[in-house]
């Protein structure tokens, strides 16, 4: 089993139809999503919901057709190895599994954009590749801000529209974690200090 990285992300999408589609994905409404996608000319770039469940990461950074890719490469005169799902996800998303969003809220803005506030865990590390994919479309009206913590491996960080800064958690006295992240993750430092006090008492 992996260590879990806790994530809070704020994602802005530029148009209401994208927000409606993303809400369907987050609510696991596959049929509504596919019906909605069919009503939009050429799907307007929305990913196809295949045999595997479509989630937050796949919505913004769709996975390849692993089976189809294998068949296509099998007919190639040059030997290739099509990536397995694990390798592709780790190399592209930055984490090995799709995420289950524990909670989200959505705000529809006056300019037609929508902002999502999401809370989810990811395996071992934050999905920085997906954040980069969202930021790559910033000229289309997308934006991404996220913070994360992986207490087991002792790091936390902040992603702000293309810039990722990661820090060793350390202790309150030694860490270089910015004050606003120390405050956000004060529960982690409280827990570590309580453990240190217990160890000191128990020898």
Where is each model-derived feature located?
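Intrinsic low-complexity, intrinsically disordered or marginally ordered coil/linker segments
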Residues: 1-203
